[in-house]
A protein has these predicted regions:
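N-terminal accessory beta-strand-rich subdomains and adjacent acidic, glycine-rich linkers
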Residues: 1-186
Length: 187
């Protein structure tokens, strides 16, 4: 990085998607200010996603939109996409330990970016999203640090895998094995 800090990117390419994660050398707690990992989709890509504060005990209605119209929307992973060429895609994270769970944000030009919110809340956008009348929401965490530490005395902070899965149909997407392949084995 320009500031002299070092970090590493691990990436895996699969026949049906990609996964990447960051490793940050550290011998103790570090402040995390945000993330720039993003995917850009073709105009006209269809997206289905949940958006809202799930911690309040009610089920959030899934949204049915185009990536052309999701700027400033919060997309709870996994978000599912249908590209104009008929390819299905899903974005999520895998192997989450000692790190803040991510959400996705709709950005300009059909870009979907990983980011963080306090308690995975809702970014208010004036779009009806199925929120209850009380409209619980939280502001997006922007340039407000949160603290993470290396896992179990290790000498680096490891982010969850950022996973993009691809398939010809929904069955292929559901049966995608990337998450299992990049995650730690169960105890």
């Amino acid at each position: 990085q320009k500031d002299g800090n070092t970090y590493y990117i691990d990436s895996w390419e699969f026949d049906d998607g990609v996964a990447l994660r960051y490793r940050i050398p550290s011998d103790g707690p570090r402040c995390i200010y945000g993330e720039q990992t993003a995917y850009t989709f073709p105009s006209g890509t269809h997206v289905w996603y949940a958006s809202g504060p799930f911690q309040y005990g009610w089920i959030q209605a899934y949204q049915d939109r185009s990536t052309d119209s999701i700027k400033d929307e919060l997309l709870a992973p996994p978000a599912t996409f249908l590209l104009p060429n008929g390819t299905y895609a899903a974005i999520t994270e895998a192997n989450l330990f000692n790190f803040h769970g991510a959400v996705l944000f709709g950005k300009e030009n059909n870009r979907v970016q990983f980011g963080y919110v306090e308690n995975k809340g809702h970014v208010e956008t004036e779009i009806i999203t199925g929120l209850p009348d009380s409209k619980f929401w939280h502001e997006e965490v922007r340039n407000i640090p949160w603290i993470t530490s290396p896992r179990n005395g290790e000498n680096e902070i490891v982010t969850p895998w950022r996973v993009l899965m691809l398939a010809e149909d929904l069955n292929g997407l559901v049966n995608n094995q990337i998450i299992a392949q990049v995650s730690d084995r169960p105890d």
